[in-house]
Amino acid sequence: MQADPQENQVRTTVDIARIIDMIPHRYPFLMVDKLIDMVRGESAIGIKNVTINEPFFQGHFPNRPVMPGVLIVEAMAQTAAVLVVETLGVRAEGKIVYFMIVENARFRKPVIPGDQLRLHVAKERHRGNVWKFRGVAKVDEVVVAEATFAAMIMDEEPQP
């Protein structure tokens, strides 16, 4: 059954409780706090509030804390995963979104405690169970990182 194209155009938000229901990530690896804008099947904007309490700041770097760039890309990927799950609806039950490829990652400016990351992701392509996205992370409307990446949705393996 095809989704109604107009239904996808409805803009919506997603709070942390729903994010936790949608993706398997948990502390200390949950990198998106909420989605403030989403068009199902197309794009989303996620928020990550960066605080000094993040465990990675203990070692990166103790005297000058900087959020690791790979975790910014992970935050974009988690935002995209929520978009995929929300887009698929009940078809995503029993499935998990796996991050599989990152390309053209660029890190433009350090992200430090107190920053609020705005994680803009847009679907470039979707074929079968593979989704390709372009992501841009901003702080105060300044681009701090960007990348293209792909994810695959697969059956979740039962836990022993």
From Swiss-Prot:
The keyword Lipid biosynthesis appears for this protein:
yes
Ordered alphabetically, the record's keywords are:
Cytoplasm, Lipid A biosynthesis, Lipid biosynthesis, Lipid metabolism, Lyase
In terms of SUPFAM superfamilies, this protein maps to:
Thioesterase/thiol ester dehydrase-isomerase
> Subcellular location, in the record's words?
Cytoplasm
The record's active-site residues are: 60
* Pfam families found in the cross-reference section: FabA (PF07977)
Can you state which reaction this protein catalyses?
A: a (3R)-hydroxyacyl-[ACP] = a (2E)-enoyl-[ACP] + H2O
Record GO biological process: fatty acid biosynthetic process; lipid A biosynthetic process
E.C. number(s) listed in UniProt = 4.2.1.59
Q: Name one GO molecular function term.
A: (3R)-hydroxyacyl-[acyl-carrier-protein] dehydratase activity
Q: Name one GO cellular component term.
A: cytoplasm
Indicate yes or no for the key word Phosphoprotein.
no
Protein task: Involved in unsaturated fatty acids biosynthesis. Catalyzes the dehydration of short chain beta-hydroxyacyl-ACPs and long chain saturated and unsaturated beta-hydroxyacyl-ACPs.
What protein family is recorded?
Belongs to the thioester dehydratase family. FabZ subfamily.
Mind telling me what this protein is named?
3-hydroxyacyl-[acyl-carrier-protein] dehydratase FabZ
| Source organism of the structure | Rhodospirillum rubrum (strain ATCC 11170 / ATH 1.1.1 / DSM 467 / LMG 4362 / NCIMB 8255 / S1)
Identify the coding gene. Answer: fabZ
